[in-house]
Design a protein with these regions (language model features):
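Positively charged n-region of N-terminal signal peptides that target proteins for export
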Residues: 1-2
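N-terminal leader/targeting segments and the immediate start of mature chains
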Residues: 19-61, 71-74, 201-212
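Gly/Pro-enriched, hydrophobic low-complexity segments
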Residues: 125-127, 134-212
């Protein structure tokens, strides 16, 4: 279950990645900030991150570090023990802990959380967007699901006021667990097309879990 939580939220970060923003004298609205990120998504980006998972009581369960690549509708995210990929059609991931390779066709509902492009392009119909009280240095935008889904119930994303770049993503889950992702660095980068090709043969001895 923990792995599912990490995958669901970490890949959501792809929608924040393209915001390699420049300083502006006028703060954009929450919706225009999202629209700008959607437009920049297809250019490709690389993000490094660290994250902490907390249980419903607030106790920290685990920490992770990883990297996420995006290009258009595609993304690749790697963090121990997961290597996950979406090639625009199929979503797959390898779990090094149990040596399983899972592949599926995600539904539009799945993609609203998993796929950055779909999340942004459908955010108005899938989420209610509201700006919360921020700090002197950051703005906080809340995304609340219009329709109940199995895992994530809401997301809060912090943006630096000076650059409009995302700095933190907090995911709240139905069971009260909370995942906090801190963005370490953002780089504008065009990944190779090979980055978004993932096959079971790359993981010798793995067990196939085909959910297609």
């Amino acid at each position: 279950k923990r792995i599912a939580l990490w995958v669901a939220l970490l890949v959501f970060m792809g929608c924040m990645l393209p915001s390699v923003a420049t300083a502006q004298t006028k703060q954009p609205t929450a919706q225009s900030l999202i629209n700008t990120m959607a437009q920049r998504l297809e250019k490709g980006a690389k993000i490094t991150f660290s994250g902490e998972l907390f249980d419903a009581s607030g106790a920290r369960i685990e920490t992770k570090k990883g990297v996420l690549y995006t290009l258009g509708k595609k993304f690749r995210v790697r963090y121990n023990p997961i290597d996950a990929n979406y090639n625009g059609r199929e979503f797959s991931f390898y779990n090094a802990e149990d040596r399983t390779y899972t592949i599926m066709y995600p539904s539009m509902e799945d993609l609203a959380i998993l796929n950055p492009f779909v999340f942004l392009s459908s955010s108005a119909s899938v989420y209610n967007i509201k700006e919360l009280s921020g700090t002197k240095t950051s703005r906080i935008i809340a995304f609340t699901l219009r329709k109940k889904m199995e895992n994530i119930t809401s997301l809060e994303v912090s943006f630096l006021r000076k650059t409009n770049a995302p700095s933190q993503i907090v995911g709240i889950f139905a069971d009260g667990m909370r995942l906090v992702i801190n963005i370490t660095s953002i780089e504008g980068e065009t990944p190779s097309s090979q980055m978004f090709i993932q096959q079971q043969s790359s993981y010798p001895g793995s067990e196939l879990v085909d959910l297609r």
